[in-house]
Amino acid sequence: MSNRKLAWTDAAWDDYLYWQSQDKKTLKRINKLIKATKSQPFEGIGKPEPLKENLSGFWSRRIDEANRLVYAVDDNYLTIIACRYHY
């Protein structure tokens, strides 16, 4: 298990709160992706892929067909950038 701390952008936290009230199944999937990403940020479930161009430095994992978990990671933090919609 990683010692990375979890951080959220304001927009990502709003996305997360949306899922809490609208779709518990999607919320469970997001939580599962976050847990996996904390320990293995660049491989595993959700088909992790590095983003390009203006999103260079961020990574993405599939929540479902329409939504993505977008995040940045370093040695200390996993920062959730978005968890709703497709970048």
Each language-model region and where it sits:
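Enriched for short, Lys/Arg-rich terminal
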Residues: 1-5, 11-28, 45, 51-52, ...
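Compact soluble domain cores
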Residues: 27-40, 45
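Residues that form generic nucleotide/phosphate-binding pockets
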Residues: 15, 33-36, 54
